[in-house]
Curated annotation (Swiss-Prot):
Protein name as annotated: Probable potassium transport system protein Kup
Family statement: Belongs to the HAK/KUP transporter (TC 2.A.72) family.
The keyword Transmembrane belongs to this UniProt entry's keyword annotation: yes
Function text: Transport of potassium into the cell. Likely operates as a K(+):H(+) symporter.
Membrane topology: Multi-pass membrane protein
Subcellular location per the Swiss-Prot or TrEMBL entry: Cell membrane
Taxonomic lineage of the native organism: Bacteria, Bacillati, Bacillota, Bacilli, Lactobacillales
Record has Protein biosynthesis as a keyword: no
A single GO cellular-component term on record: plasma membrane
InterPro entries: K+_transporter, K_trans_C, K_trans_N, Kup
GO MF, one example: symporter activity
Catalytic activity: K(+)(in) + H(+)(in) = K(+)(out) + H(+)(out)
Chain's gene name: kup
Amino acid sequence: MSNAHHDAFDKATKAGFIIALGIVYGDIGTSPLYTMQSLVDNQGGLSQVSEAFILGSVSLIIWTLTLVTTIKYVLIALKADNHHEGGIFSLFTLVRRMSRWLIIPAMLGGATLLSDGALTPAVTVTSAIEGLKAVPELSSIYQNQTNVILTTLLILMVLFGLQRFGTGVIGKLFGPVMLVWFSVLGISGLLNSLQHLEILKAINPYYALHLLVSPENHRGIFILGSIFLATTGAEALYSDLGHVGRGNIYASWPFVKVCIILSYCGQAAWILAHKDSGIALNPFFASVPEGLRVYLVILATLAAIIASQALISGSFTLVSEAMRLKIFPLFKITYPGANLGQLYIPVINWSLFAVTSCTVLYFRTSAHMEAAYGLAITITMLMTTILLAYYLIKEGVKPLLASLLMAFFAFIEFIFFLASAVKFMHGGYVVVVLALAIVFVMVIWHAGTMIVAKYVKSLSLNDYKHQIKLLRDDLRFDLYQTNVVYLTNRMKKDLIDRSILYSILDKRPKRAQVYWFVNVRVTDEPYTATYKVDMLETDYIVCVELYLGFRMPQTVPRYLRTIVQDLMESGRLPKQAQDYTITPGREVGDFRFVIIEERVSHARQLSTLERFVMQTKASIKHVTASPMRWFGLQYSEATVEVVPLLLSDVLKLPIKEIKACTKDEKA
C-alpha cells in the first residue's frame, strides 16, 4: 500500500466528514428515536419516572457511549484495520493464524451481526412512522397501528426493491441529510436542556452507578437492556472503516457524540417537565413544538431509511467476505455501481426483506421490537473483544495488559448481555434463532470444506507430465479443446487432486495443446490481484496461483486473459495462431473450463457426522450460486464433472455368477 494511500486513509477532509455522517452513523444516530421511550415504558410510564431515574439513565447512556463506543471502537478497534478495511471478518483475517479456534468467535460475531441487521430497518422505520401520532393533523390516522405497519412495509418494500440499482446518485444525499439530522438533534436537545440545566449533572458517573442499585429503578440491572440501545451502532462504525477512512471517523465522531448526547439530555429535560402530565407520546417527538413535528417525522424517516440502507449494504459486504473466506455458501453477486465496494446479493436482499417484513408484522409496534432488539449485537461485541485481545498481542502489547484491557470491556459487554438476555422471552428469540440458523450454515460449510481437504488425495504433476505430453501429441484422439482449464481449490507446488488427473487421463482422455490448473487463493488484503505461474519446465502445462483479495470478484476468465497475454509476450507460452477467426491476427485458441465436483459416496472412511455434514452441504448447494456463475464462467465453455469424494474404498459386494447349464447337465 502506497504512503499516499495510507496518508489519505488517516486524513480528514470536509467531504469525507460529510460522507462519514451518511455511511457510518445511521444506526447509532437513529437510536435517540427509541432509547428514551424504551426506558420510560419499561419504568411503567411517565408517572413512574423520578429525577434520579432520569439523571441516572442519561448518565448510563453517556458513559456507555464513552467506554464502549469511544474508547473500545473509535480509539482501539479502528487501529485494527486490515489494509484499511474494518469489521469482524477483517479483524479475523489479521489474527486467524494465531489460533485455529478463532474461527468460532468470527462465525458467532458475523452471524449475530447479520441477524441484527434484519431487525434494525424494522425498528428504525417503525419508530419514525409512529412519530406521526404526535402530529395533530395526522394523529387520527396513525393512532391506528395498522396504518403505521402498512406505511412501514411500503417504505421497506421500496427500499429493498431499489437495491438492485445501487445507491449511486441518491447515496450522495445521505451525508447532507444526516448532517441536518445531527444538527437538529443537537439544537433541539440543547434548547430543551436549557430549560432544566440540572440534567447536565448526568455527566457525573455517580448517577449511573447509583441508579443500578436504587429502588427508584424498577428493573434493576435489567435497565441496561434499554441503555444498550444507545450504542448498538458501534459495531457498524468499525465495519464501515474502509468506506470513509480512519481520519474522517476520528474527525466526525466528536460532533456526532455531542449531538446524540444533547438529544438524550433534551428528551430527559422534557420528561422532567412533563412527568406528571400523563402524556403518552414518544419523548423524541413530543419534545419538539407541534408545528415542527411533521418536519421532524419526515427527517426522522429519511434518517431511518439511510440507517437501514447502511445496514443492508453492510450485510452484503459481510456475506461477500464470509463467502470468500469459505465459511458461507456462494451466492450470486452483482455490482450495480461504478466501484467494487458497491455490491448487491439478490438472495440476501430478499431474505432480509422477508425477515424484516415478518418482524414488523409479528411485533407490530416499535416498543415490542425494542424489547427484542440488542440481544444479538451484545454477542457480536463480545466476539469482537475476543479477537481484539489477540490482535493487541500480535501487535506487541504484553499479553497480560491486553488481556486485562479486553477483560474490562468483556465484563461490561457481558453485563449488557445478561441484562439483554431477558429480552429472549420478549421476542429476542427471533433474532437468536436467526443467528443460530446462520451459524449452522457457516459451520456446515466450513466443516464440509475441511472434510474434503482431509480425504481428497493429491498426485504430483511431474510424475504424469510425460503421459500428458504423449496425450497432447496423440492424433488418435480428437482435440478436446486448444486450452483446457481445471479450477481447483487445492494445489501446492506440483501437487493437484487425483480426480483432476483421472479426468484428463482416465475418464475420457482429453487432448489439448495446453493444460491449465488454476487455484484461486483469497488473501487477507481486500483488493489484491496478483498471480504466480509454474510451467514445470514445459510449454503445455501451466499451474497458476491466482491471489485475489477477499473483496475482489473471482471472475477467472478475465484474469486468465491477461495471464495468457503475459506468458505469450514473454515467450514462455507458444502462440496459438487461428486459421479461422473474425479477429485478424488472433493468436490465442479456444478455452474450456472444467470444474470437478466431489459428491459423497458410501465409503467406509466417512463417519456418521462427516456424512451428515457433507449431505447437508450438498442440500444447501441447491439454493446457492453455481461454480459457473461464481467464477464468471456463464459466458464461457464450461463443464462440471461429478466424482465421488472417495475413490479408493469401494465396497466389494458379494455376488455369485450363475453358470448356464450344458446339454449333458439338462439331460
